[in-house]
Regions:
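A cytosolic small-molecule/anion-sensing beta-strand core signal
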Residues: 377, 393, 472, 537-539
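Beta-strand elements of repeat-based all-beta scaffolds
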Residues: 1-86, 90-109, 113-130, 134-220, ...
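A motif-centric feature for acidic-aromatic and gly/ser/thr-rich catalytic loops and repeats
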Residues: 4, 98, 257-258, 352-358, ...
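Short linker/helix segments within small regulatory modules
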Residues: 553-556
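Catalytic toxin/effector domains delivered as secreted proteins or via bacterial secretion systems
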Residues: 591-595, 599-739
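Short, flexible loop/turn elements at secondary-structure junctions
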Residues: 20, 175, 180, 199, ...
Length: 739
């Protein structure tokens, strides 16, 4: 049981003790004379003392002192943030327009890179200029839609096209030697039914079908079809991948039941092809961390501390046990390897040490494995003993040099990498919606297909199609040929280091294939993973640069800005996908408390329209409407809770919406369909839905899941006043099929 203690006079929370806590490990809080949070402190079961101290000036947070580092926030007129410092070093400074609108005019990084912004008379962004002279310009047509966007750095111009309902129906990129266009087709319920991508004259079509609950029932991409079966809780129980009528891969899933209640935790994952059958079995601890994975031959077990950080990996297949230790700020301090054992450790076979010697920024790595690490002012790594790095536009990795070979990166206006070259070898990349769609390496073209959840499904290479086999964490563990035989097999450690690459095509397809651990893009020559916003070094288990939120101070409220996945690489990934939960949280952090509305085309509305819980309500209310014999319309209202399922969208809704209020206005529509004398009257039911709530954090949550941790961080922030509650509503329509 979790115990809470409140001050008898002021009713403020003084301490929290979780079931595994003692009086020495509980979390304690103190407050200033205005009852704002002054300190928060706790000690983990491994002895790490975690703490944070808050300082205010005129109701604005001006200093945050963590266990290792002090962050300072300065403000100018109208309480607009003017700078962020770590210790005595400036990370970012801000200037604003002199007019009453006070738009952000320039962001200057501590390394003197900058971005300058320009606006039109309507306050719309019209241009960005960078320190190297490169520019991105924006223009708008008479309807307010974005006109073609030229990018001087990449030489690519992007044009967007919309239909009469303001839905994006096509975007096109053009440049020297580059032509990429994507067109979208929607049904009457605004569900995407097909997507046609044309790359340098070659077209690929992806089509979608949906079941009665508006869940994707099949997806066909580049001629590969994957179909889905769901259980009563909306969980995927089977995926079948086919090439035409031939089944290549069948995957089935079972789920854990805890205390008689269903969960989204996968218990078994069986992957079957004609040449390969593997059954993975998973076990979990009370916090939902994966504690063991077995493939029927070998088992890997994992141990975590009370902060859910990975502290030990026992890898039976590799014959290695690894232990990991961290300081009180979540920085890894030692990575030690031993001969495989699940019991008492023997003599260490390898040790990688970490040193954090920057007195201003104690989270910044200064030495690793005996090598000196250098970084620039804002935390971008410059050298690590094996590689050297240069940067542009603040946080874009411009070059990587390893073994005397320099790789130069090129990015588009959105900061997405489009090319890397060493002068002899060149990789070109084309992305569609955050997914790598095509890669060309020295004239060899690879096209990629994905399933409904964004997991890699297939790749064309050398005139043949190959199929990805992945585990539930998204790692590409094998590549299969058309007969289902594995031609490439990969193994990884917990942090994504590639341990082995085997198979008949290991030296060709296995080397060229960029999609590896977690489906991330792997740069074979440098050993880095490209995660779009940052680069990740699996040898160190850290990012090369600080979280992008450092430039606004937002990331300070969360976890270590260099740590990868909360130091829990087994159970988490760092997708670059768009998170509604993140946007809504940032609105609470940086907003003024004003109401927010999300329309039919918003990411929130799109995910709500696929929510099993909301669609079930719609079905029930349609039945009530029919039974009522209403002539015009009926209005229904109440509350519903989003289901925290297994997909990224499910978890996003659970974090952002949780439980909310809804109003549903249902009407009946009729039409006559047919041809010549063969006509039929059809009917459907349409609902205009308003989902609304107050976005706030009014209570502490038990447990140490990611959602609970984020809620409790925000709970403290709301008490302090730097998180502002606001009302929000999403307005959208859903409809039944015509019958």
């Amino acid at each position: 049981m979790t115990t809470y203690s409140y001050n008898a006079n002021t009713n403020v929370l003084e301490w929290v003790k979780y079931p595994n806590d003692t009086d020495t490990t509980r979390t304690n809080y103190t407050y200033d004379s205005m009852y704002r949070l002054a300190t928060a402190a706790a000690t983990t079961n491994t002895g790490s003392a975690l703490s944070a101290t808050y300082t205010y000036t005129d109701d604005l947070l001006t200093k945050l002192q963590t266990a290792t580092t002090a962050y300072h926030f300065a403000y100018g007129d109208f309480a607009l943030r003017s700078s962020i410092q770590v210790g005595s070093t400036t990370l970012a400074s801000y200037t604003y327009t002199a007019d009453r609108n006070r738009y952000l005019q320039q962001l200057t990084y501590g390394n003197q890179d900058f971005v300058r912004y320009a606006y039109d008379s309507y306050g719309r962004l019209t241009g960005q200029t960078y320190e190297d002279g490169s520019t991105v310009t924006y223009a708008y047509d008479n309807t307010g839609a974005l006109a073609p966007v030229p990018d001087s750095a990449s030489g690519i111009k992007t044009t967007y096209y919309y239909d009469l309902t303001d839905r994006l129906i096509q975007y096109a990129e053009t440049g020297t030697g580059h032509s990429h266009a994507v067109g979208y087709v929607y049904d009457r319920e605004n569900k995407l039914t097909s997507l046609t991508e044309k790359i340098n004259g070659t077209a690929f079509t992806t089509s979608y079908t949906y079941d009665d609950d508006n869940r994707v029932s099949s997806i066909t991409d580049r001629g590969i079809t994957e179909s889905y079966t769901y259980d009563a809780y909306g969980r995927v129980t089977q995926k079948v991948t086919k090439n035409g009528s031939a089944t290549v891969l069948t995957e089935t899933y079972t789920y854990r039941t805890v205390s008689g209640k269903p969960t989204g935790q996968i218990a078994t994952h069986r992957s079957v092809s004609s040449g390969r059958t593997v059954t993975y079995t998973y076990n979990y601890d009370a916090n939902g961390n994966i504690t063991s994975v077995s493939d029927g031959t070998h088992t890997t077990t994992y141990v975590y501390d009370s902060a859910n950080q990975l502290t030990r990996e026992n890898n039976q297949a590799e014959g290695v046990t690894r232990t990991f230790t961290y300081d009180r700020a979540g920085n890894m301090t030692a990575w030690t390897e031993y001969a495989y054992t699940t019991g008492t450790l023997g003599a260490a076979t390898a040790t990688h040490g970490y040193t954090y010697g920057n007195s201003n920024w104690r989270d910044q790595l200064t030495a690793w494995n005996g090598n000196t690490i250098t970084s620039d002012t804002i935390g971008n790594m410059l050298s690590d003993g094996t590689r050297t790095y240069t940067w542009r536009n603040g946080r874009e990795l411009a070059t990587v040099t390893k073994g005397g070979v320099t790789w130069t990166n090129t990015y588009n206006a959105d900061g997405i990498r489009t090319k890397r070259t060493n002068g002899t070898n060149t990789y070109s990349y084309i992305y569609n919606g955050g997914r790598l769609s095509q890669m060309t390496v020295d004239g060899t073209v690879m096209n990629f297909a994905y399933d409904a959840s964004g997991t890699p499904m297939a790749v064309t290479y050398g005139g043949a199609t190959y199929y990805y086999a992945t585990n539930i964490q998204g790692d590409v563990v094998a590549i299969l040929n058309a007969s289902g035989t594995a031609v490439v097999t990969y193994t990884y450690d917990a942090w994504g280091n590639i341990l082995t690459t085997t198979g008949t095509l290991a030296s060709t397809l296995g080397t060229h294939n960029p999609l590896r651990y977690r489906g991330y893009v792997y740069d074979q020559e440098t050993g880095l993973y490209y995660l779009q916003s940052r680069y990740y070094n699996p040898e160190m288990g850290r990012f090369l640069s600080a979280d992008s939120l450092v430039s606004t101070g937002q990331g300070i409220l969360g976890n270590n800005m260099f740590a990868y996945c909360l130091n829990n690489p087994v159970c988490h990934a760092d997708p670059s996908g768009h998170m509604v939960a993140f946007d809504m949280f940032i609105q609470a952090l940086d907003g003024d408390g004003s109401d927010q509305e999300y329309d039919d085309e918003s990411e929130l509305a799109k995910k709500l329209k696929k929510s099993h819980a909301l669609l079930q309500l719609f079905e029930e209310n349609v039945e009530k409407f029919i039974a009522s014999n209403a002539k015009d319309y009926c209005i229904y209202h109440g509350t519903f809770s989003t289901y925290s399922g297994t997909t990224f969208a499910d978890k996003d809704l659970a974090l952002s919406v949780g439980a909310a209020n809804y109003t549903m206005t249902i009407t009946k529509e009729t039409r006559t369909a047919g041809f010549l004398w063969i006509k039929q009257e059809q009917t459907r039911y349409v609902a205009t839905v308003i989902v609304h709530d107050i976005y706030d954090f009014t209570e502490w949550r038990d447990g140490s899941s990611f959602g609970s941790i984020m809620n409790n961080i925000a709970y403290i922030g709301q008490i302090m006043g730097y998180i502002k509650a606001y009302r929000w509503q999403a307005v959208f329509t859903i409809a039944t099929d015509w019958e």
